[in-house]
Design a protein with these regions (language model features):
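Short acidic (Asp/Glu) and glycine-rich catalytic loops that position anionic groups and cofactors
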Residues: 228
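Short amphipathic alpha-helical segment within the helicase RecA-like ATPase core
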Residues: 1-221
Length: 228
């Protein structure tokens, strides 16, 4: 499906190029669309000069007040199939809008008897969204891990998931076991690990690409925690 997206403020200017003015005005009035902040109106293809489905998105009086990521999620929630999107007027915060559109497509149906876990394939005409896709895939990977119950998320399974993720990426993964943790005084990790019959591990991922700066990211993956 091809979808055009047109952003309009509350003055409703800038649509003449894409619609017959009289028909457009009548349609907006019928559906009480006034270009207010976060208003979204779906306009049928028969009204558009491009003959595509068009989402008219309201920006209100002052677009400085708009959270463009949240606006993207509102737009994305209206899309329920694969779609090729064209922005008729590009905003300076288009990347945030794209992120919102993509992230809201997430589904986690792994434990449903009828699996409908396929994610809508969204592409963007005339825009390079490759970085947005990489971020989306990373976010979805993390969400899948979070949503997977501890019973199916052992440390060993987590290690396998990490290795699958970084395969062919140039990232070297080193895995250190409980004995290594004991020898290197990782008391905190070992202390938390005592709450489970599954032994803890310590993972190191090294990306040794040439770069001006070296960055270390440190985090913990507590796969099961009852709180305290």
């Amino acid at each position: 499906m091809k979808i055009d997206i047109l952003f309009l403020n509350d003055e409703m200017n800038g649509h003449d190029e894409y619609f017959d003015n009289d028909l457009f005005q009548e349609y907006c009035e019928t559906h009480s669309f006034e270009g207010k902040k976060n208003q979204i109106l779906s306009v049928p293809p028969s009204y558009s000069k491009s003959e595509n489905l068009t989402f008219i998105v309201g920006l209100g009086e002052n677009k400085e007040d708009i959270n463009f990521y949240d606006l993207g999620t509102l737009i994305g929630s209206k899309i329920n199939s694969d779609a090729e999107i064209k922005f008729l007027n590009v905003m300076e915060d288009t990347n945030l809008i794209i992120d919102g559109i993509l992230y809201v497509q997430y589904k986690f149906n792994n434990y449903k008897s009828e699996d409908d876990s396929s994610v809508n394939n969204i592409t963007f005409q005339d825009l390079d969204s490759s970085e947005n896709e990489i971020k989306k895939n990373s976010v979805f990977w993390v969400r899948d891990l979070i949503n997977t119950p501890a019973l199916d998320k052992s440390p060993e399974e987590f290690i396998n998931k990490v290795r699958e993720l970084v395969d062919s990426s140039g990232i070297e993964v080193e895995v250190y076991d409980q004995k290594w943790l004991e020898e290197n005084d990782f008391g905190g990790v070992l202390g938390v690990g005592k709450g489970s019959d599954r032994p803890p591990y310590f993972l190191v991922g090294k990306y040794n690409s040439k770069a001006k700066y070296q960055v270390s990211l440190i985090g913990k993956g507590v796969l099961f925690d009852t709180g305290g």
